[in-house]
A protein has these predicted regions:
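Transmembrane alpha-helices
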Residues: 176, 198-234
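Transmembrane-helix boundary motif in ABC transporter permease subunits
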Residues: 98-129, 142, 291-296
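Transmembrane alpha-helical segments of polytopic membrane transport and secretion proteins
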Residues: 1-45, 290-302
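Interhelical loop and adjacent transmembrane-helix boundary motif
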Residues: 77-78, 232-280
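C-terminal transmembrane helix and the adjacent membrane-cytosol boundary/short C-terminal tail
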Residues: 177-181, 219, 259-302
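Glycine/proline-centered hinge or cleavage motifs at structural transition points of membrane proteins
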Residues: 136, 194-195, 208
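Periplasmic/extracellular loop-to-transmembrane helix junction in inner-membrane transport proteins
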Residues: 22-41, 55-98, 118, 259-270
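Generic hydrophobic transmembrane alpha-helix motif, especially the helices
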Residues: 130-166
Length: 302
């Protein structure tokens, strides 16, 4: 006995639903392509200023970046050549002082916000830190001038390091807090379940897990204050010679660049361009270190 099974009938004519949705599909693809193009243009616009600045600094200042620039003191007016050796050394001295002041206070403040503080107290501390992050740098300089320079009766490297360190504190503190909050709570709970004291768990487990993130925040803060000029005008003031005591004025690359840029001498202008290029390379080097640290952390987490 033969059995016939009816087969479904397919039509080659497109359905009305397909005819209505096909244009919508093309329109969605067009909007997606348009959005990609707009975001690409915006990304290029973000990178373009850095490329233009770097190109102009290389064009104007690279010719003056020779061995003398890194090893010699500034020459008097009318003499060509010379360098910014004292300003380069002064910049690292100021950054070292800033790190000594800003890193411990900022890191411990971030630990308090993440591990110990109450919600209301934390809100006020975060609010104060965010406000301090937005305070103009010249205001920092005026405050330290009144509190440090005037009582000491003179500008000094110590005052310059203090103002940069104070500017670092809120940024390091907020970065440390955010990094510590990324550590899974399971680490804390496991440590407490084993009877480990909370402070020891924070120091040896939580902080160690977030160490690279904390270092990243410190480097970002150093990169930010490395190019500050206004607060140093009120504190370090500048010096054309080597500084042997922290109680004496000290040269710094931003100050030297500023002094040379406003001068009427062409040779000093070239030195200013070279100094600006060297300062930009320093900041780029610090930021490159930050990228290496964060990339390694993200790859290991992945």
């Amino acid at each position: 006995m033969e059995c016939w099974i009816p087969l479904p009938q397919y039509s080659t004519t497109p359905s009305p639903h397909f005819l209505m949705t096909a244009p919508n599909h093309r329109w969605r693809k067009f909007k997606n392509a348009l959005m990609q193009a707009v975001t690409l243009v915006c990304a290029i616009l973000v990178v373009t200023p850095l490329v233009l600045v770097f190109y102009h600094l290389v064009k104007e200042g690279f010719s003056s970046m020779n061995w003398a620039f890194f090893t010699q003191l500034p020459k008097p007016v009318g003499e060509t050549g010379g360098g910014m050796a004292n300003a380069i050394a002064g910049t690292f001295i100021l950054l070292g002082q800033a790190a000594v002041l800003g890193v411990p206070i900022g890191v411990l403040g971030g630990v308090f916000l993440s591990e110990y503080g109450t919600s209301r107290l934390n809100w006020w501390i975060r609010f104060a830190a965010d406000v301090l992050n937005g305070v103009p740098s010249i205001t920092w300089g005026m405050v330290v001038y009144a509190l440090v320079v005037v009582p000491m009766k003179g500008f000094s490297a110590l005052a310059g390091g203090i103002v940069l360190g104070l500017m670092m504190i809120p940024l390091v503190m907020r970065t440390t807090e955010e990094v510590l909050q990324l550590v899974p709570n399971g680490y804390r709970e496991a440590a407490l379940a084993l009877g480990i004291a909370k402070w020891r768990a924070v120091v040896q487990i939580v902080a160690r897990t977030a160490l690279k993130g904390i270092v990243t925040g410190v480097l970002l803060a150093l990169a930010r204050v490395a190019g500050e000029t206004a607060p140093l005008l009120f504190t370090a003031f500048g010096n054309h010679f080597w500084t042997h005591k922290l109680t004496d004025p000290i040269a710094a690359m931003p100050l030297q660049i500023f002094a040379y840029a406003i001068s009427p001498y062409d040779d000093w202008h070239r030195q200013a361009w070279a100094g600006a290029l060297a300062l930009l390379l320093l900041v780029l080097f610090i930021n490159a270190g930050v990228r290496v640290l964060t990339r390694d952390r993200f790859q290991r987490n992945a």
